[in-house]
UniProtKB/Swiss-Prot annotation:
Organism this protein belongs to: Saccharomyces cerevisiae (strain ATCC 204508 / S288c)
Role noted for this protein: Probably act as a zinc ion transporter moving zinc from the nucleus/endoplasmic reticulum to the cytoplasm. Involved in zinc ion homeostasis and cellular distribution.
Entry membrane topology: Multi-pass membrane protein
Ranges annotated as biased composition (Basic and acidic residues): 634-648
Family the UniProt entry places it in: Belongs to the cation diffusion facilitator (CDF) transporter (TC 2.A.4) family. SLC30A subfamily.
Keywords from the UniProt entry: Endoplasmic reticulum, Ion transport, Membrane, Nucleus, Transmembrane, Transmembrane helix, Transport, Zinc, Zinc transport
Name of the coding gene: MSC2
Protein name: Probable zinc transporter MSC2
UniProt-annotated stretches for the region Disordered: 614-653
TM region positions: 7-27, 59-79, 91-111, 135-155, 175-195, 220-240, 245-265, 299-319, 387-407, 418-438, 454-474, 492-512, 529-549, 564-584
Domain of life: Eukaryota
Entry GO terms, CC: cytoplasmic vesicle; endoplasmic reticulum; endoplasmic reticulum membrane; Golgi apparatus; nuclear membrane
Record GO biological process: intracellular zinc ion homeostasis; transmembrane transport; zinc ion import into Golgi lumen; zinc ion transport
Length: 724
């Protein structure tokens, strides 16, 4: 696995267990509901007990799984990950996700994460030609007996387990769920495998884009209506039974993590498909096998282990505990390790695959025709933005993990930090979009290209950093005078440490993916880098201040660390703001200013030239002025000059300045020769100029009195006509 594949897979490790947990928390947990019902009087509880449990089962076994499964299919369709070419495919996948959602409601979230991943691994590595042999009873039992044993031991060793109070039903429910799972894998696997063998929803070049769009629009109402309808039913159930309430914030986290999950998968698969283009036919490379992509790209070695560990961390952050005791905590960790060990036996990597999937590892180059691709593919495949795009997905996934913890813990500080991360993700996205757009060629609508978007993005990031610093200073000063004692320092330390690791990955990704191209692109990358650096410094400050507070119990360390971090960010952001604002205002530095003055002095001393007007020059980037430009100007003498700048020498391919100038010549001189002399002067100093030559007594707009008296400062550019 190369570095880029690792960066693309990390968001999957975070988003998948968060999807499992947040889907279970859309409605209050079963234990919370029992405690609420038990808090009422004994008579009321006895009367409502039957209604309560029947409603609870209806929500957890019907309405909530329907909402989760339909939402999953909706996002898969929206991100063009699965092409629902038939309703049968939609119904099969909906039923599979529905069943997995029921399992997540029965088992512990950590167990659900490992079991569902193992099921997906079994299905994607099974032989489609003989699924009954690949998934026979012996194989399935051999796979799930260790998990059945561990689940029963965890339930029995739970300190809250009480056989007399009906906790035995938990054991019977778990056994029934495993039995149903084994039977489903045994008898429904052929249908599921035939569905998984279908291609992903990426249209080949031979397929009509119009027909594909029409077919998507015809099926989209069916896919969209079911999530809305199931959510409305869930909401109506909360109205009927006041014990329930829908956690809208958890719905937001669930949808956000689904988006990150599919974007990360698409990112991972897009790179693999791009690598194959060099060695195989393009038509084949546009069609991917879902089974291959999942088993060979996503669920590779140690993926289940790492995802299970992430599930443990996410559960700890949400509930401040893994399970109810140390023994069951260790058993849960053993459950994750066993899941990885069992999955290694199903990870059969045959030498001869039915589709001959050759995995080519090659570096992405700029030679790929990305101009006509979607914005997503351009960010995902461009070598300068790919690593940063993968970090953006990782940062967004961690933001949703923080949001989940802040909702559960009611922590306003962590919620504020999550919103800060959302602002950072927005800044990263703006910077990446600007980096892609600046590489677009010039056009009739944008004759100078979009290169200055990089400068604008850098300036925007600088302003956002300035706002963040102001917010940090205000909050820190307030906490100096009104100290806030931190209590949940352990959880805060875990979150800050994870945030530090994520940001260190971001710095590493930036160093790996971004290169110094100079100019506006460099300013854009500098703005992105400063945002990542600001987050890293913030995480370092939180870790250090939290450790000092734990040791000394002095809350003053928190605002002091914030002031130091804010000062460092400010010192880094001010130079970025200064340079980008100067470029936006088209300001010339001293070196370029002297370059223009030297060229103008040469023009003023050229024989046959009486003067010049309106010299306008500004910094530019390579490729920004390659568009053919026609400058037509009519005078009383009816002179018309067209000039196309397609010079091939090195000085004009990468000019440092671009602009235009009007030059007046002596009557009787050849205008073509005069223009070529002026062009040669500018070419020698790497300035790309549009030159308009005109007779000395012409009535051009540039000869107006106001233009002739622009400046009388001898240190400024000589704007007035030069007299003979």
């Amino acid at each position: 696995m190369n570095l880029q594949e690792l960066l693309a897979k990390v968001p999957l490790l975070l988003s998948y267990p968060t999807i499992i947990l947040s889907s279970n928390l859309i409605v209050p947990s079963h234990n919370d509901l029992i405690s609420r019902a038990a808090s009422t009087s004994a008579a009321e509880y006895a009367d409502e007990k039957l209604i309560f449990f029947s409603t609870d089962h209806a929500i957890r076994l019907i309405f909530l799984p329907t909402f989760v499964a339909s939402s999953f299919n909706l996002f898969a369709h929206y991100f063009n990950f699965i092409n629902y070419s038939s309703r049968r495919k939609y119904y099969v996948l909906f039923t599979a996700i529905y069943f997995l959602s029921i399992l997540t409601a029965i088992f512990h979230p950590i167990q659900s994460t490992c079991i569902t991943l193992l099921i997906i691994k079994l299905l994607t590595t099974a032989d489609e030609s003989s699924p009954k042999i690949a998934l026979n009873f012996k194989t399935i039992l051999k796979t799930f007996v260790p998990f059945i044993t561990l689940t029963l031991v965890i339930l029995r060793w739970d300190p809250s387990f009480d056989a007399s109070s009906g906790d035995v039903n938990k054991i019977s429910t778990s056994l029934a769920a495993y039995a149903l799972l084994i039977l489903t894998l045994r008898y429904a696997s052929p249908l599921i495998l035939s569905t998984l063998s279908s291609s992903i929803g990426v249209v080949s070049k031979d397929t009509s884009v119009a027909q594909h769009s029409i077919s998507r629009n015809k099926r989209f109402p069916l896919i969209l209506v079911l999530p809305i309808f199931s959510f409305v039913l869930l909401y109506l159930m909360t109205i009927v039974n006041k014990t329930y309430n829908i956690q809208l914030l958890m719905v937001f986290v669930f949808f956000g993590c689904l988006s990150i999950f599919f974007l990360s998968l698409k990112d991972l698969f897009t790179e693999d498909g791009n690598q194959k283009k060099g060695g195989q036919e393009d038509e084949y490379c546009r069609m991917f096998d879902i089974k291959y992509m999942i088993s060979y790209l996503w669920l590779t070695r140690f993926t289940i282990l790492l995802t299970g560990i992430m599930a443990i961390v996410v559960h700890f952050l949400s509930f401040n505990e893994i399970t109810s005791s140390i023994k069951t905590d260790l058993l849960s960790l053993l459950f994750v390790v066993v899941a990885e060990y069992v999955s290694s036996f199903s990870n059969k990597q045959p030498d001869s695959h039915s589709h001959n999937h050759a995995h080519h590892h090659s570096h992405l180059t700029d030679s790929l025709p990305l101009e006509n691709e979607s914005m997503f593919k351009q960010m995902a495949l461009n070598k300068d933005t790919r690593s940063i795009f993968s970090f953006l997905l990782l940062n967004t996934a961690f933001m949703f993990v923080q949001l989940l913890y802040s909702f559960r813990s009611k922590s306003l500080g962590l919620l504020s930090d999550s919103l800060h991360m959302a602002l950072d993700c927005t800044s990263l996205l703006l910077g990446l979009i600007a980096g892609v757009l600046t590489k677009k060629p010039a056009s009739d609508k944008f004759p100078f290209g979009l290169n200055y978007l990089g400068t604008l993005a850098g300036f925007t990031n600088g302003v956002l950093l300035l706002g963040i610093v102001c917010g940090i200073f205000v909050e820190a000063i307030e906490r100096i005078f009104n100290p806030i004692h931190l209590h949940a320092t352990n959880e805060l330390l875990v979150v800050a440490t994870l945030g530090l690791l994520v940001n260190l990955v971001g710095l590493f990704a930036f160093d790996h993916g971004a290169h110094d191209h100079g100019g506006t692109d460099n300013e854009n990358m500098k703005g992105i880098f400063l945002h990542i650096l600001a987050d890293t410094l913030g995480s370092v400050g939180v870790v250090i201040s939290t450790l000092l507070i734990k040791l000394t119990h002095w809350p003053i360390f928190d605002p002091i660390a914030s002031l130091l971090i804010g000062s460092l960010i400010l010192l880094s952001a001010l130079p970025l703001l200064k340079s980008t604002s100067a470029n936006i205002l088209l300001r010339l530095d001293d070196k370029k200013h002297n370059l223009v003055k030297s060229a103008l002095n040469q023009i003023s001393t050229t024989p046959g030239i009486t003067g010049y007007t309106t010299p306008r020059f500004w910094p530019t980037e390579s490729g920004s002025s390659g568009h053919s430009h026609a400058h037509t100007h009519s005078h009383a003498e009816n002179h018309s000059h067209e000039h196309h700048h397609d010079q091939k020498n090195g000085s004009q391919e990468h000019p440092s300045l671009v602009g235009y100038i009007h030059v007046q010549y002596v009557d009787g001189e050849n205008s073509t020769i005069i223009k070529k002399r002026v062009e040669k002067i500018f070419e020698n100093v790497s300035i790309k100029a549009w030159v308009q030559v005109e007779p000395q007594n012409s009535t051009c707009w540039c000869r107006a009195t106001s233009m002739n008296t622009i400046s009388a400062n001898p240190n400024s550019l000589p704007l007035q006509p030069i007299a003979n």
